[in-house]
Amino acid sequence: GPIWRGGDHGEAAQLASCYRSCLTLALENGCRTVAFPSISTGVYHYPLMQAAHVALKAITDFLRLHPQLSVTMVCHSPQTLHAYQVVWNMLYQETKPHED
């Protein structure tokens, strides 16, 4: 994933491309399920809420075209889970994310 440099250096496009590329490779290799962490939000310092927005939008847009694939977001902290829940609710108020 991209290193955060203030948001004016194409980071969002790079992050979305990262998710799409992984999903495309998964399909090409016959995978049915993919699990993602919150890419670039650790040592690359991508702001969590912005990263969640990019990730969820890129993934859901991809899944609309390829519904045979299943994606799980792995949230390693309560803060990450909260960010993804908030962004999910902002983007898709009519549906709920699946929690295990």
Model-identified regions with their sequence ranges:
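Phosphate/ribose-phosphate-bearing ligand recognition and processing surfaces
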Residues: I3-D100
